[in-house]
Structures are given as C-alpha cells and as structure tokens.
C-alpha cells in the first residue's frame, strides 16, 4: 500500500488472524599518541555509543515495546511499566516495572490518571534505575486512560532530570472514546509538554481515514504499530549505519526543546519511489499540519540496496521546497535489504501548529498556559 499506515493495517490484520562482536578492553587505557588498532578503535566507538531507552507506559505503551521486541530493534533498551500485572507479564521487554504495587495491587489504574500518577510516584526508584545512564529516553503511551496518562509525565520528568534527551510519543483518543478520555488526554499532554524535550502526537482520530472500516480491535493495533514504527524510525537513525549517517548530536539538535511535534510516514515502490514516498509522508493523515511554519525537521529515508544518494536527496529537496527556508533540516538515509525496489520516508516536524493538538493555536495556547495549574484529571 502507499503508506506505512496502510502497512500497519496489514500487520494488524495478519496478527489478528494468527491470534557483537567480541568484547574489547575499555577505551580509558588506549594509546592515543598516534595510530590505533582496530580493537582500540572499537573500544572508542563503544565508549561513544548512545544509550537509548524506550519506556512503554500503560497498555498502549507496553504494546509499543512489545512490537519493538518482536521487530528485534537494535541499540535500545526496552522497558515496560504498568499497573496491570496481567498485561505486563505478556509483554516482551528487557525490564518490567509493576508500578504502584501497594496502590493498585497489580490490578490496573481503573482508567483513573490520578491513580496512574500515584503508582508511578510510588515506583520512582525503579523508574530511575531503569533509565540510569541513558542519553536518550523515549516515553510512549496512549493518552486518555489511567496508567499511561498518569505515569508518562512522571517517567518523562525522571528522564529529563537524569540528563537524558526526553522524547514522548503518544496517541490521543478516538472521539468515540468519549469526552472524559479526551479531557484526561489534554491534561496529560500539558503535563508531558512541561517535562519533555519534544512530544510527538499521533492523533488516533486521523487514523480513522485509513482504518475506519476495520473492527475496533484492529484499529487499536494499527495505532500501536504506528507508535512502534515512529520510535523505531528515530532510534535506528542513530543506531544503524547509513549512507548518510546521523548521530545523537544531530538528533539532539532538532529534538532538544523541540516542543510539540508531528510525524509523517510514507512509502512507495513506484518508478518514482523517492518523490512518491515523501509525498505519501507529507499526505499522511498523521501529519495534519502545515509544515511551512515548522522550525525544524528530522528526516529518515530508508531504501533497498538499489537506492541511490540522488533519490535520497530528492526526498529532502521536496521537503526543503515546502518548509520555512530558515528551518533546520537534519536527514539521514540507510539501506534495508528487505526494501528492494521500495523507499520509506519518515518526517518529524517540530514547533508545529495543528487543530489536532490541544492548545497549539495562539489564543488557545495562551489560555492553556493561564489555566495549566488548574487542569486536572477527570474521574
């Protein structure tokens, strides 16, 4: 299909039907007076490795971590944090945290964000231990419910205080989920904006353009898949070698204090796959925003071994033509042998304004800031 959202639908349908190299000495004692051996160079590289942690909060966040575990993502530690022990035991992760055991007895937060927040505060020590030493922390959750909405800001705050670049990637509820969940999502988003460098918002309502005819269960699986692909796309910009490499400093340039961001995902296997993949990303229902006003963009172009630098540059040129000429654009490109004859484009734009994001237009933003301290979760 033309977009990664469509690909995510295929993944959800398929799932529903089925119901390092040797260790070297540390770099500290390396002879730095001249030439270096391969082992010494590897040791330097190891010391410079970016430590990335992904923390999935609540049910949706846990599902994201589980999908990343299934995908075999490289270079990131996976942490699942939940108040529901039954859900937590089914998740594949490097570390699992049962938050608020005394508060909830492992029975969940009952769709109450205040309970999720208190549970996370009870388990702060375990949260700090899980993210210790991280250079970058992704906090992923579905906003509107109890555990994810309440705990994600607590986790993000801990990550930021530890010195990590903190990126939250969250979904907002389908309208059909009701006003209470929407109100709680708004409160959770405001809290996340206060404690994260960048918050990437994936509005579930926009997914309805692609999944409107799917059963509810599969629609939520598509949402989980999009979260996973978003985190994976940014992570592997740093961890996977590419034709045009990005490093942690590049990503930090765009994401540090980036504010609210949105993401576009697209792919194409046509003869004009470079142009079509970027157009698909820019048309993505998730990227419900005029990118001409964005202040920064992070672009990841992935293709098969047949992809040329010229094709990758064509993607970036298309974005340059549409964005503020003063905006900062950082891009990288990598090869995935499974994408022979195909190209995928991921665009993250920061400093955006969109009706899908609570409080982002001028008057609403000012009003939100005035009442921020009064915003609370609805029981």
UniProtKB/Swiss-Prot annotation:
Q: Which UniProt keywords apply?
A: Cell cycle, Cell division, Cytoplasm, GTP-binding, Nucleotide-binding, Septation
What biological-process GO terms show up in the record? cell division; FtsZ-dependent cytokinesis; protein polymerization; regulation of cell shape
Q: What are the recorded GO MF terms, alphabetically?
A: GTP binding; GTPase activity
> Which segments show compositional bias classed as Acidic residues?
8-19
**Signal peptide span:** none
A Gene Ontology term for the protein's cellular component: cell division site
The residues listed in the UniProt record as binding GTP, with positions renumbered to this chain, are 59-63, 146-148, 177, 181, 224
Return the protein name.
Cell division protein FtsZ 1
Q: Which organism is it from?
A: Haloferax volcanii (strain ATCC 29605 / DSM 3757 / JCM 8879 / NBRC 14742 / NCIMB 2012 / VKM B-1768 / DS2) (Halobacterium volcanii)
| UniProt lineage | Archaea, Methanobacteriati, Methanobacteriota, Stenosarchaea group, Halobacteria
């Amino acid at each position: 299909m033309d977009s990664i959202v469509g690909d995510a639908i295929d993944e959800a349908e398929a799932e529903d039907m089925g119901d390092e190299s040797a260790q070297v000495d540390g770099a500290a004692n390396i002879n730095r007076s001249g030439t270096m051996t391969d082992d010494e160079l590897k040791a330097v590289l190891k010391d410079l490795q970016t430590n990335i942690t992904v923390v999935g909060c609540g049910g949706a966040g846990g599902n994201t971590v589980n999908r990343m575990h299934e995908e075999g993502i490289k270079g990131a530690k996976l942490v699942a944090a939940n108040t529901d022990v039954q859900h937590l035991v089914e998740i594949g992760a490097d570390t699992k945290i049962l938050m608020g055991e005394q508060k909830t007895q492992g029975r969940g937060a009952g769709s109450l964000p205040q309970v999720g927040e208190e549970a996370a505060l009870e388990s702060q020590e375990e949260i700090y231990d899980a993210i210790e030493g991280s250079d970058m922390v992704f906090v992923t959750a579905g906003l509107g419910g109890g555990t994810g909405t309440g705990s994600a800001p607590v986790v993000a705050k801990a990550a930021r205080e530890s010195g990590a670049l903190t990126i939250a990637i969250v979904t907002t509820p389908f309208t059909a989920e009701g006003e209470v969940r929407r109100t709680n999502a708004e409160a959770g988003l405001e809290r996340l904006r206060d404690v994260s460098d960048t918050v990437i918002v994936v509005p579930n309502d926009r997914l309805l353009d692609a999944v409107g005819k799917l059963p509810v269960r599969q629609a939520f699986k598509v949402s989980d898949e999009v979260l996973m692909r978003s985190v994976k796309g940014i992570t592997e910009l740093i961890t996977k070698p590419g034709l045009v490499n990005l490093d942690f400093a590049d990503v930090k340039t765009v994401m540090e204090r980036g504010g609210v961001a949105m993401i576009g995902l697209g792919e194409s296997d046509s003869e004009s796959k470079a142009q079509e993949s970027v157009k698909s990303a820019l048309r993505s229902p998730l990227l419900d925003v005029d990118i001409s006003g964005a202040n920064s963009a992070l672009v990841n172009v992935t293709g098969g071994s047949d992809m040329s630098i010229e094709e990758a540059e064509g993607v970036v040129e298309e974005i340059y033509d549409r964005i503020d000429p003063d905006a900062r654009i950082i891009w990288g490109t990598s090869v995935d042998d499974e994408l022979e004859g195909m190209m995928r484009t991921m665009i993250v734009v920061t400093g955006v304004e969109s009706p899908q994001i609570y409080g982002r237009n001028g008057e609403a933003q000012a009003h939100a800031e005035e009442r921020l301290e009064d915003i609370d979760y609805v029981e």
